[in-house]
């Protein structure tokens, strides 16, 4: 009887580990694709506004500041960039340490929600400047998909944002 349970556990544990790796690979793949769309759209929007940020839009946390600068709200962009850096540091800390402190996890969740709200506010300002009719609809779609469509929407409207729309 003990042999069957050992065989069962030997099959379940690798399955759970493989599922964990698959989910981790999909998350990393999504983050890379999202970052690429986000950087390209920020680069094109800043080029349309005659800003010289071609290479700076590819700096991971600085591009959030540039998005804030595009919407004439540097403070929100700076706060978002700092929040994203803190979220990254806490996530690495939680991943590296085997024992997760509940305090770090709660702080991480609060910071993720706060950065999501600030990201939605910045995106809504860009949507409102480009398509004032559809800005609310795009923001609702962005919120309902938990921000998954934000880089794609920004990528689609990147060439419509210029000095005239600002």
Segment roles from a protein language model:
Residues 1-31, 81-118, 166:
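Membrane-helix interface segments in multi-pass membrane proteins
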Residues 27-83, 118-166:
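Membrane-interface extramembranous regions at the lipid-water interface
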């Amino acid at each position: 009887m003990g042999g069957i349970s050992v065989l069962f556990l030997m099959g379940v544990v690798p399955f759970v580990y493989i599922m964990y790796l698959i989910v981790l690979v999909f998350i990393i793949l999504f983050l890379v694709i999202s970052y690429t769309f986000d950087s390209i759209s920020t680069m094109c929007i800043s080029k349309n506004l005659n800003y010289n940020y071609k290479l700076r839009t590819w700096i991971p946390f600085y591009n959030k500041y540039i998005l804030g600068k595009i919407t004439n709200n540097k403070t929100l962009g700076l706060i978002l960039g700092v929040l994203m850096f803190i979220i990254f540091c806490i996530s690495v800390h939680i991943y590296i340490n085997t024992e997760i402190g509940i305090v770090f996890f709660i702080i991480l969740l609060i910071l993720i929600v706060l950065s999501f709200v600030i990201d939605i506010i910045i995106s809504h300002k860009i949507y409102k400047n480009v398509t004032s009719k559809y800005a609310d609809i795009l923001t609702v779609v962005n919120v309902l998909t938990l921000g998954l469509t934000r880089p794609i929407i920004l990528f689609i409207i990147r060439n419509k944002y210029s000095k005239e729309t600002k």
